[in-house]
């Protein structure tokens, strides 16, 4: 809503985009080649155990690779609606956060993530590995590493490695597009975990 008002007040008009060409490129990339590699991508609320259930009860996952919303990022779904639409999501933006991880406090946020990790653990093989890309946003007074470590405690996963993954590059930070003073992106981390 803010961005739309900003453009209208200034009489700005976006450059024309051939939406069908964008869709065609995506379709060719997604459906143009097949691979012997198998895997599953889920678009669901992973706090719900049934969201992660495999096709058959005996199937177990070997890898979980994820990047959950960062603490305080309440507009995660609306900000990603176009990407979501390309993979089958709704064709309109829904400005609500009712189906998102709780952001009321760092403790509540970590507890919600812990439920996700427990649900993932319950459908993984004994030697499964999980990799989490996690960071923070600058206006939150919570340490991303403390949050992710807290979320993984008593979750069925044990942290084996934490690596700095750098920061989001300035050119890719949509939050800075209309700001006079650019914010400094926080360091992101790759957290590796295994089942104990």
Residue ranges, per PLM feature:
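SAM-dependent methyltransferase catalytic-core segment centered on the flexible catalytic loop
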Residues: 51-63, 69-129
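Short, surface-exposed linear patches
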Residues: 63-64, 85-89, 152-155, 183-184
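Class I S-adenosyl-L-methionine
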Residues: 141, 145, 149, 156-196
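Flexible loop/turn segments at secondary-structure boundaries
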Residues: 48-51, 71-75, 138-142, 168-173
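SAM-dependent nucleic-acid methyltransferase catalytic core
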Residues: 1-66, 71-72
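Well-ordered, non-membrane alpha-helical segments in soluble/globular domains
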Residues: 20-23, 113-115, 145
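A structural motif corresponding to the C-terminal end of an alpha-helix
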Residues: 23-39, 116-128, 155
């Amino acid at each position: 809503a803010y961005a739309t008002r900003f453009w209208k007040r200034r009489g700005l008009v976006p450059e024309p985009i051939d939406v069908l060409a964008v869709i065609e490129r995506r379709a060719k990339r997604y459906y143009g080649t097949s691979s012997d590699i198998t895997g599953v991508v889920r678009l669901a609320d992973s706090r719900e155990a049934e969201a992660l259930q495999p096709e058959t009860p005996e199937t177990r996952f070997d890898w979980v690779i994820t990047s959950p919303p960062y603490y305080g990022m309440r507009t995660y779904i609306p900000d990603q609606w176009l990407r979501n639409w390309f993979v089958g999501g709704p064709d309109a933006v829904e400005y609500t956060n009712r189906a998102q991880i709780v952001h009321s406090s760092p403790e509540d946020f970590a507890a919600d993530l812990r439920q996700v990790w427990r649900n993932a653990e319950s459908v993984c093989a004994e030697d499964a590995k999980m990799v989490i890309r996690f960071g923070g946003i600058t206006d939150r007074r919570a340490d991303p590493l403390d949050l992710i470590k807290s979320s993984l405690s008593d979750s069925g996963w044990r942290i084996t490695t934490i690596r700095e993954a750098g920061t989001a590059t300035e050119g890719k930070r949509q939050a800075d597009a209309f700001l006079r003073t650019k914010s400094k992106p926080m360091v992101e981390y790759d957290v590796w975990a295994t089942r104990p």
